[in-house]
């Protein structure tokens, strides 16, 4: 009886948490290449400030890099943000174990929206070994769940500067898959339609191709918006000399909103922010939707607008200069009633020297499918094997059997059906491949004591998917695979459908992601399977720690 009562209370609480009140700011929606207020259809320009310090708050001696979880600090800073005419803050990492309600309400009451990065330093797509895994997807979903019911959440970034030059463009396929899956998750959970986008660096070799890549394809795969961290205008420059004219011409045909996800070059100090007049002026507002100044807090990189000493705030010259510029803008405004959205589609970039990401995207991570596969194995890794030893085992086994079933290659657009599983599940899969290839005797499942035999089982809900995928894990499972028990229904596929730290003039060290190239041949996929495990291991450890901290009722520090 008590359980039923608690369940009803929990259901009611969840319902009311998702209901917007009269005091909530209107949600921001995307129409064509612009943002609009949902209540009256007037255009929304981002007047943003990056708002996250390396040591945003401290709890029990642990540094928690989450400014939205410290009401004392955010309530202190909101009046200063309002002096800067701020209507958006960007937050780079979220600690989902902490409470954000007080700060989010205070920001709402000040008419300030939030764009939150889904990644964090320990849970992001690694540009050197890109993967899109169950653990990473679960981490992103937790951030969505934490903030979805706040109407002043403008959107989410699924990555920040993951691809940062032409050598690691393949990583963008994994970020685009994250955008696709997070957006679908938002829909599946019946949350309001919250935009999901990407924040890029301004690399001359890749910027146009990368923008086209994230803007191309069907609505279910392309980004809802695109940010570029722009540091071209330094000191007393102008629209043409700075490069702004060229960038505006390059992005004029985008059918999604584009804005500066960071800006504010500090090669000349104090910063004058004369670019503000140009950004919100007639030369740029047809294409650009504003920008986010980097950054609020003064740190060693000297990008701060204010310095903080305890609870005292001191405004710097940059603060005064930016305030003077941002408070005199008056951009032209469109309205959804008269606005005609851009309908022209952007072509996905062809692969070549400066672009190597395939339009075929990684499959949607499905933990239930991984559980099905693991239960169907006869030979599995022993529980007492240290995860630090996995790489050695992968290297040896993948020289003996084809590990394509657990590999992911963003260049070739080839992804094993189990490429999103945990390293332990993947290791068991390839151990079982070796065991069966070698004859299936007990000695074939030894691996110097690292493996053990189990009774293989296949649940009825698993059999069809496992049969279609095949013993090597390289085929696709058609249709929706409902594997129940805490997993989402998704299409298990080895080829998912779809179209696809700066110096003084750069961005924050809290940038969320870094990643790399996978090879396409069978021999390369063996090597890739071994190297991809390193990124996955970090995610497994991080997720386990978070789970333990939640169970113990303690906060977890994102550092």
Curated annotation (Swiss-Prot):
Disulfide bonds join 74-103, 216-348, 234-265, 370-421, 372-462, 379-445, 398-403. Residues 484-526 have a biased composition (Low complexity). Disruption phenotype: Increases cellular chitin level. Increases chitin chain length. (1,3-beta-D-glucosyl)n 1 binds at residues 92, 119-127, 160, 294. (1,3-beta-D-glucosyl)n 2 binds at residues 161, 202, 207. A lipid is attached at residue 528 (GPI-anchor amidated asparagine). One of its GO terms (biological process) is fungal-type cell wall (1->3)-beta-D-glucan biosynthetic process. Changing residue 348 to S: Impairs the folding and stability of the protein. Extensively N- and O-glycosylated. The GPI-anchor is attached to the protein in the endoplasmic reticulum and serves to target the protein to the cell surface. There, the glucosamine-inositol phospholipid moiety is cleaved off and the GPI-modified mannoprotein is covalently attached via its lipidless GPI glycan remnant to the 1,6-beta-glucan of the outer cell wall layer. Its EC number is 2.4.1.-. Residues 1-22 form the signal peptide. Residues 474-526 are annotated as: Disordered. It is found in: Cell membrane; Secreted, Cell wall. One of its GO terms (cellular component) is cellular bud scar. PANTHER family: 1,3-BETA-GLUCANOSYLTRANSFERASE GAS1 (PTHR31468:SF2). This is 1,3-beta-glucanosyltransferase GAS1.
